[in-house]
Structure formats: C-alpha cells, structure tokens
Amino acid sequence: MSAENRIRALRALGQSIWYDYIRRDLLDSGELARLIREDGLGGLTSNPAIFDKAIAGTDLYRTAIRDALRADPGLNDEALFFRLAIEDLQRAADVFLPLYRETGGADGFVSLEVSPDLAHDAEATVREARALFARMDRPNAMIKVPGTRAGVEALETLIADGVNVNVTLLFSVARYAQVLEAWMRGMEARLERGEALETVTSVASFFVSRVDSVLDPLLEERIQEGRPAEHLRGRLAIANARLAYAHFRDQRGGARHTRLTAAGAHPQRLLWASTGTKNPDYSDVLYVDSLIGEHTVNTLPPATYRAFLDHGSVAETLAEGVETARAQVAALADLGIDLESITDRLESEGIEAFQKAFRHLLGVLAEARQGKR
C-alpha cells in the first residue's frame, strides 16, 4: 500500500492523521503543503517543547526575532514567543484552510497551547485562550488547554464562548470522562442560546506511550518476583486508550450527544498523542496500528509519521478487545499497581516538562533580546 493510500485509507475508516511538529522551514519549503496534497495529512499540533526545539535549537528564527524587536522594542520574552508561534501557526492554518472547508469544519486544524504556567488557573486560562484565539483569527485554529481540573473548568466556558479547544495531557479515563462532560455542557449552553454548534470544534488529546514507559519497569519488577505480569508489558497504554474510546462510544449513543449531533455539532474526537514508540523492543508503529477507529485523530511526530507511511497497517482496531482491556487494567490492580496514581503522576510530570521547555525557550529569547544570540 502506498503512503498516500495508508493515510487516505485511515480517513475512510474515520481517523485523521495530524502532524505533531512545527518549524518555520516546514512552511517555507512547501513541505507542509506537500504532505497535505500528496499524503492526505489532516492537521497539525504544537506544544512548548516542539517550539523550544524549533526556536532555541535552530537559527531559523533569528531574523524574525530581530524584526519583531525592531517593530516593538517593548515586547517581553513571552509576548515575543507568542508572536513567533502565531506567525507560524497562522501560515499553517492558511495551508490547511481548503481542507477545513472541504470537510465542513471537521478537519484541517492547527493547535496553539496556552502558557503551561496557567495549568491550574481556570480564569487565567480562559482569558489567555480567548486572546490567543482572537489573535490567531483563523476558523481552523484550536487553542490547547491542559486537562487539569482547572483546564476542564476552562473548557466548558471556552466551548460555550465558541473557542475551538484541544484539551491536552489526558492520561486517565476518569479525567477524559470529565472533559467529555464539560464539552457537552459547553455545547448545550450554546444550543440553549440558539448559537451555532457546527462552527465550534474540540479534540481530547489522550497520551499513550508514556503510560507504558512508566508501567513496564514496574511490571518487570513483578516478573522478577515470579508474579504473572509478562502478558501485560507493552499492553496497558493501549488498554487505557481503548477504555477511553469505549466511554466515547457509550456517550455518543446517548440522548445528550444525539441531540447535539442533530443540531449540527461535530463530535469531540479523541486524539491519540504521545504515539511515538519509546521502547525499541516494540514496533515503531505500535501506537498507530493499535488505535485505529472512527471519530479519532492520531498526531504523529515526524519519525513515527514516516514509519507509518512505510509499513503501517490499516484496519479498525480500537473497537475490539474492550473486555480484554478491562481485564488487563484489573490485573494491574491485582499486582498492586495503582493506575490512577500513575496517571496523576504523568499529568503532573507532563505539565512540569512543558513548563521546563517553556522557561528554556523564554531564556533563549531573553538572550536574543540582549544580543547574545
């Protein structure tokens, strides 16, 4: 099967592939347009770590930084970052705009994240998300909000306001259920006010491979103790994702979701994130091949994207094995491993990692402002 056929075959099954990457040369070279035209790429995601690598790790932004500071010498480091990021993502959104229109607003999105320092402040998250969405000024822009308790609160407000939202750093089915509920409440508020539903789109970014990265060493300890855990290695991340998808399907069949769909709402799709394989013993497309299903997105880093184009498999895999997934999670508890505490830890670590990348990036921009880079 050709690369084009793989991506388009996934679309026929109801899944869209997005690109978990942004850098200015992706736009300048025409490569992004080529990926959309030739491969069928459906969207793009960014985060502070991706922008840290793009801006701090290359010289591609040197001229843009100089020009921005000449135009507005009063820019602080964070304002300078958002100016650079918005420039990139507006251009990317424009490249995706024909796809957005062709799909009736269902696909062709780009995502910009609020400051990770706001992860536990709902009001500040709402203010910044509204401001960034207005500055992006593109119908196919999404604002990324972390899936913390504060982020869930912000989500409901933002959806009701008409802001497209990508809820990120989701690790547990319980937190995802809260996110889906908040999305429904936000959409119901719009419906009650007689406002359009089809113009507001959201995804819920559920992180996958990091779950196995934490659990596999714990399972190895149990194996060394002679306990039955070998069958769970490399399985729990996919099981966790399958249970999230099962919850989505249950809710989609319910009266509230049906009412929203009838009024024009696009479903809040699950977006599989952190799908690059970190364990070299596993297939490099494990978290792509195993998570294919209708009304989902998978955002792939470049290496995983290329691997899937080369040798990925295309078949519906998400809806199967739900009872097996439940049994695997139950077996984990029998081994004395608390999945909820693991996912809570992963949420905290994810926020800290983005904060660290953000601080590093702002430090680099501070040096640039002082003429040190």
Swiss-Prot record:
Its EC number is 2.2.1.2. Keywords: Cytoplasm, Pentose shunt, Schiff base, Transferase. One of its GO terms (molecular function) is transaldolase activity. Disulfide bonds: none annotated. The active site is at K144 (schiff-base intermediate with substrate). One of its GO terms (cellular component) is cytoplasm. This is Transaldolase. The gene is tal.
